[in-house]
A protein has these predicted regions:
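A short linear-motif detector with a strong N-terminal bias
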Residues: 42-45, 64-68
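Conserved active-site segments centered on acidic
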Residues: 1-59, 121-122
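Functionally constrained cores in energy, signaling, and assembly domains
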Residues: 22, 30, 35-37, 47-48, ...
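Phosphate-binding/catalytic loops
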Residues: 63, 69-123
Length: 123
């Protein structure tokens, strides 16, 4: 969703977007619920593969955006010496759809979509 918003604002050439999870198993495809939520927005997760957060990955980034403040807190505990700025994408909080039905993934997508304009302005 962020890539699509950046493209819409003509910013894709300036910003590279990476996705990683604090408990992700690297190489897994997106869940069916996530795929359906993105399809409803004309987006595809067909090529998406999960990736676990690593210290090396964090240090290559210029900004880390967590879906919740608890994600940011966890990253700061795991990588206390990481110099990369971190912000939470949680005003209001993004619901966690993990293990939920299609409605849970749709709600999370709506939560993220609602906050994209503020994130784009921040960038």
């Amino acid at each position: 969703m962020l890539r699509a918003a950046l493209k819409e604002h003509g910013m894709m050439d300036e910003i590279q977007v990476l996705s990683a999870g604090t408990y992700a198993l690297s190489g897994a495809t997106a869940s069916t619920g996530a795929q359906r939520a993105m399809q409803r927005r004309g987006l595809s997760l067909a090529d998406h593969r999960s990736r676990a957060v690593t210290g090396v990955l964090l240090e290559t980034c210029s900004l880390i955006v967590g879906l919740t403040q608890s994600h940011i807190n966890q990253l700061r505990m795991m990588y206390p010496d990481c110099p990369t700025p971190m912000i939470a994408f949680d005003d209001p909080p993004v619901s966690d759809p993990y293990g939920g039905d299609d409605a849970a993934y749709e709600q999370a997508a709506c939560d993220i979509q609602r906050q994209l304009p503020a994130l784009i302005q921040h960038l």
